[in-house]
Amino acid sequence: MAGAEPFLADGNQELFPCEVCGRRFAADVLERHGPICKKLFNRKRKPFSSLKQRLQGTDIPTVKKTPQSKSPPVRKSNWRQQHEDFINAIRSAKQCMLAIKEGRPLPPPPPPSLNPDYIQRPYCMRRFNESAAERHTNFCKDQSSRRVFNPAQTAAKLASRAQGRAQMGPKKEPTVTSAVGALLQNRVLVATNEVPTKSGLAMDPASGAKLRQGFSKSSKKD
């Protein structure tokens, strides 16, 4: 306030200008006005909306502006690569038709072309478009975690199996006791002696000839 030029108002009262708003106040009033005026001017004011002011006191709701959705960037089509793939496919088809007519073996197919718009997955190394790649990622990650090959762990399993087989030793063949062997021999002898007989016929165990019941084989008379 020292540098401010005083102003004599009516009644010979000196008024001093405010450094912020430029209005003039008495010395005692300016001391109270200064801090308040600085706070008001330093505060960020919201932008004034005349639409809200006009709609106040009415039943019309305020219209919220929908944010404009950003359109995804259009990818450049790789027409040159597609044209070359098309020409290679036609040439390969002509070579196959010519080989069939001449009876020669079919030529190898052209190498597969890589679509630059497809995304390669790090787990299976296959390529998908963007939407399919997002769906496939979790499934492929789960499958690859199940099929992790650990050479050290596999070698340890094989070694433990071989050691267990060596400790078991060779399989012993089943042995037949003497009592069981004698029983089997008796059954064989009984089976050979017992022959089914027909009406009135019997089998001679010595010669194997059939005899009538009640008669025995006699020697021929001289």
Curated annotation (Swiss-Prot):
<feature type="zinc finger region" description="C2HC/C3H-type 2; degenerate">
    <location>
        <begin position="117"/>
        <end position="146"/>
    </location>
</feature>
<keyword id="KW-0862">Zinc</keyword>
<dbReference type="GO" id="GO:0008270">
    <property type="term" value="F:zinc ion binding"/>
</dbReference>
<feature type="region of interest" description="Disordered">
    <location>
        <begin position="48"/>
        <end position="78"/>
    </location>
</feature>
<feature type="binding site">
    <location>
        <position position="33"/>
    </location>
    <ligand>
        <name>Zn(2+)</name>
    </ligand>
</feature>
<feature type="binding site">
    <location>
        <position position="37"/>
    </location>
    <ligand>
        <name>Zn(2+)</name>
    </ligand>
</feature>
<dbReference type="InterPro" id="IPR049899">
    <property type="entry name" value="Znf_C2HC_C3H"/>
</dbReference>
<keyword id="KW-0863">Zinc-finger</keyword>
<keyword id="KW-0479">Metal-binding</keyword>
<keyword id="KW-0677">Repeat</keyword>
<dbReference type="InterPro" id="IPR026319">
    <property type="entry name" value="ZC2HC1A/B-like"/>
</dbReference>
<protein>
    <recommendedName>
        <fullName>Zinc finger C2HC domain-containing protein 1B</fullName>
    </recommendedName>
</protein>
<dbReference type="Pfam" id="PF13913">
    <property type="entry name" value="zf-C2HC_2"/>
</dbReference>
<comment type="similarity">
    <text>Belongs to the ZC2HC1 family.</text>
</comment>
<feature type="region of interest" description="Disordered">
    <location>
        <begin position="196"/>
        <end position="222"/>
    </location>
</feature>
<feature type="binding site">
    <location>
        <position position="18"/>
    </location>
    <ligand>
        <name>Zn(2+)</name>
    </ligand>
</feature>
<feature type="binding site">
    <location>
        <position position="21"/>
    </location>
    <ligand>
        <name>Zn(2+)</name>
    </ligand>
</feature>
<feature type="zinc finger region" description="C2HC/C3H-type 1">
    <location>
        <begin position="14"/>
        <end position="43"/>
    </location>
</feature>
